[in-house]
Amino acid sequence: MEFRLPVLLSFLLFFLMLVRHWKRSKGQGKPPPGPKPLPILGNLHQLADGLPHYAVTKLCRKYGPVMKLKLGQLDAVVISSPEAAKEVLKTNEIKFAQRPEVYAVEIMSYDHSSIVFSPYGDYWREMRKISVLELLSNRRVTSFRSIREDEVWNLVQFISENEGCIVNLSERIFIMTNDIVSRAAFGNKCDDQHNFTALLEEILQIGAGFAIADLYPSLTFLRPLTGMKPALERIHKKMDKILEQIVTEHQIKRKAAAKNNTKFEEEDLVDTLLNYAEANKNEFHLTTDQVKAVTLDIFSAGSETSATSMEWAMSELLKNPRVMKKAQEEVRQACKGKSKIKETDIQNLEYLKLVIKETFRLHAPGPFTPREARETCEIGGYTIPAKAKILINLHAMGRDPTIWKDPECFRPERFEGSSIDFKGNHFELIPFGGGRRICPGISFATANIELGLAQMMYHFDYKLPNGKSLEDLDMNENFGMTCRRKENLQVIATTRIPFQK
């Protein structure tokens, strides 16, 4: 009996430990695979060699389409297959409808009032409704047609006036898209537009990469040491002054119309927001700061996405003369005899649309679509914990040989006869995201890109400066909120189709 009692107690203790382990394992579920993290750093050291999105994609090839990473203090899950992306963005879209908190956004977005980064809830739903039904509806995008045609034409004139000289095409494309968005959002090119654009550039540079404040959120004492907070506060103060002036000018015009008993004609996106605030003031209180936040959202996202995509499309066309020739022949045949292309002329340019799809496949405006798990759930057979940061890896899916034949080859013909689009319905190609938080500006961006590319291909032939061959064109990119070219695209243009000034 003396011998049996210790054995029985030992067995009971062992059994209780097994039960405890089983319960813990059941509660945690099956975690996604991933590389072993280091103390403090996690897996950050594995992203330090080269561009982070290339490093993450390389790890995904090894560990699979649902991969766990430890980024400092953050638990991140990288999604790299259309099937897993569909589970996140469609099957479980409410569970992943949250955007992760970003320190820079906290400072710049007027207390998370932007459409892009505001928390999932009543405010976000209301602003999303305004965006889809009012700000960026198809009717509204069509109403901006004359603005697009004017500003694309200004780009064509600039290139023509500098025929035979080196043109910084990247710079001119970004100026064009900024002008389009400025006129659509503010009603005209604002006096401080150059300063405003320069401030946006600063935000993109500061926000590029992984910020210490985001990777180690509990170590708040580190924030002053990086210099990020004072830099962002300085930029925000300057931007707020410009936006405040714009909103005030619009309010003055509205008051003048009311005083004179004249009908106020809505002109731009700021007018639309102010009209909504006035019409719904008893149901939904839209503050001036929220108007500024949404305006900043539209300006930054609308300009940056269109310009980055156009820049990469022109780069790929130059790098692939066969594709350039085919695209030029299509637009020149369709618009033969015309000195100026209008938006209605490009509706049937099917190959141009394939070029844009192929550009989005290889060069999504941003390499990752971020989400946050609102609750614990299962993706691809793995348990995703609540609060985990989700990175949908557009870069990996666009270059996956199991999805695309010869994925590194720029071949628009791969989409011929295909129903695949980039509007969130086909998860192998989601440059604008998907689900409830899909970018509401798809139509606006697409219209800018189509007209800009069509005009540039119609009127000009191009070569690289300084006798460089097309094979020498540098296709390296930067990492940031959007992935621009590392070096500006510089070309020498020759007029092929004359135009009338």
Swiss-Prot record:
The keyword Coiled coil does not apply. Keywords: Heme, Iron, Membrane, Metal-binding, Monooxygenase, Oxidoreductase, Transmembrane, Transmembrane helix. It catalyses: dihydroniloticin + 2 reduced [NADPH--hemoprotein reductase] + 2 O2 = melianol + 2 oxidized [NADPH--hemoprotein reductase] + 3 H2O + 2 H(+). GO terms for molecular function: heme binding; iron ion binding; monooxygenase activity; oxidoreductase activity, acting on paired donors, with incorporation or reduction of molecular oxygen. One of its GO terms (cellular component) is membrane. Its cofactor is heme. The keyword Plastid does not apply. Its EC number is 1.14.14.-. Its main location: membrane. It is a single-pass membrane protein. It comes from the Eukaryota. Pathway: Secondary metabolite biosynthesis; terpenoid biosynthesis. Heme binds at C439. Mainly expressed in petioles and roots, and, to a lower extent, in leaves. It is found in: Membrane. The chain crosses the membrane at residues 1-21. Monooxygenase involved in the biosynthesis of limonoids triterpene natural products such as azadirachtin, an antifeedant widely used as bioinsecticide, and possessing many medicinal applications including anti-tumoral, anti-malarial, anti-rheumatic, antibacterial, anti-inflammatory, anti-pyretic and diuretic effects. Catalyzes the conversion of dihydroniloticin to the protolimonoid melianol. Belongs to the cytochrome P450 family. PANTHER family: CYTOCHROME P450 71D11-LIKE, CYTOCHROME P450 FAMILY 71 PROTEIN. This is Melianol synthase CYP71BQ5. It comes from Melia azedarach. The gene is CYP71BQ5.
